[in-house]
């Protein structure tokens, strides 16, 4: 099947994969088959078919709980759960193929991407999807901890531009952070969305902050983000109806959905 897709292709954008933390803990085999073996298959075919450039969508979750903020690409990688590990292993396959076989590839480590047409179904996960479904239903936002944790919320159009610029470049064998150039409290997001709040227990193995150092991608590719959080949230609210069929998470459902998270990651170091 992949062989047919690969006819007359100049660029490959490898975004296919399994996301979400809890399912990766419960079904690690699926994640290894898709995110690791799948990435190997893409690297192999990209080389065989002489693709001009392959761009891999890596995850900033590879950093685990970073020691430095903003976090540079040289920071230690310490994935804390199978999703993060499998995305990191996929990246390492591409970097190895670049080093050994001279595959033209770049890896973009994405930070907290959000925007219209995001997935609206599936397991409990990204804060934007959870909050937007709650807002549409007139329910309180379920804020993890006290909401002072910060995230590098990065708008999807900025990410798309990074992929395009990377594909058009002559750069290869590099890992590049893609972030907003800022980090925002979850409480800030709540204030922009406007609504009541219920605080739920903080989860283990989650960083208090994500914040990309984007110096490298700016220097090597001239890329920089253009969409502020305020602008991005305004766009999301324009598309609020997209979440009308999304799962609606309350405290009881979240507690049930995250049992494996607490069970296996509570003593994670």
Language model: regions and residue ranges:
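N-terminal Rossmann-like NAD(P)+-binding domain of SDR-like oxidoreductases, especially those catalyzing
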Residues: 1-113, 157, 234, 239, ...
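Residue-level signal for the nucleotide or nucleotide-sugar donor/cofactor binding architecture
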Residues: 26, 34-37, 80-81, 122-126, ...
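Glycine/proline-rich active-site loop of Rossmann-fold NAD(P)-dependent oxidoreductases
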Residues: 88, 113-129, 137-139, 144, ...
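Hydrophobic alpha-helix immediately C-terminal to the catalytic Tyr-X-X-X-Lys motif of short-chain
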Residues: 89, 93, 97, 127, ...
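A short C-terminal helix-loop "cap" of Rossmann-like NAD(P)-dependent dehydrogenase/epimerase domains
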Residues: 102, 131-143, 194-201, 215
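C-terminal "lid/loop" region of Rossmann-like NAD(P)-dependent oxidoreductases
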Residues: 146, 175-176, 184-191, 195-214, ...
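Conserved C-terminal active-site "lid" loop/helix of NAD(P)H-dependent oxidoreductases
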Residues: 156, 185-188, 203-225, 231-235, ...
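Hydrophobic "lid"/C-terminal helical patch
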Residues: 163-167, 190-193, 214, 233-240
């Amino acid at each position: 099947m992949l062989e047919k897709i690969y006819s007359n292709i100049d660029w490959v954008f490898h975004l296919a994969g399994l996301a979400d933390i809890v399912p990766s803990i419960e079904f690690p085999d699926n994640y290894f088959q898709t995110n690791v073996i799948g990435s190997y298959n893409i690297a192999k075919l990209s080389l065989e078919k002489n693709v001009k450039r392959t761009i891999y969508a890596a995850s900033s979750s590879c950093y685990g709980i970073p020691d430095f903020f903003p976090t540079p690409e040289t920071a230690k990688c310490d994935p804390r759960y199978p999703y993060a590990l499998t995305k990191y292993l996929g990246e390492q396959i591409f970097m190895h193929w670049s080093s050994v076989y001279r595959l033209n590839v770049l890896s973009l480590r994405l930070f907290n991407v959000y925007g219209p047409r995001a997935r609206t179904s599936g397991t409990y996960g990204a804060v934007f999807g959870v909050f937007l479904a709650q807002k549409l239903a007139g329910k309180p936002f379920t804020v993890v901890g006290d909401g002072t944790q910060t995230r590098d919320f990065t708008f999807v159009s900025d990410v798309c531009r990074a992929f395009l610029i990377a594909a058009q470049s002559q750069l290869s064998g590099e890992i590049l952070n893609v972030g907003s150039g800022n980090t925002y409290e979850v409480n800030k997001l709540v204030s922009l969305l406007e609504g009541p709040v219920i605080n739920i227990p903080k989860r283990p193995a989650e960083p208090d902050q994500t914040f990309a150092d984007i110096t490298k991608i700016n220097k090597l590719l001239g890329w920089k983000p253009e969409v502020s959080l305020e602008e991005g949230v305004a766009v999301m609210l324009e598309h609020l109806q997209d979440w009308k069929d999304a799962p609606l998470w309350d405290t009881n459902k979240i507690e049930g959905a995250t049992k494996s998270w607490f069970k296996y990651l509570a003593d994670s170091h």
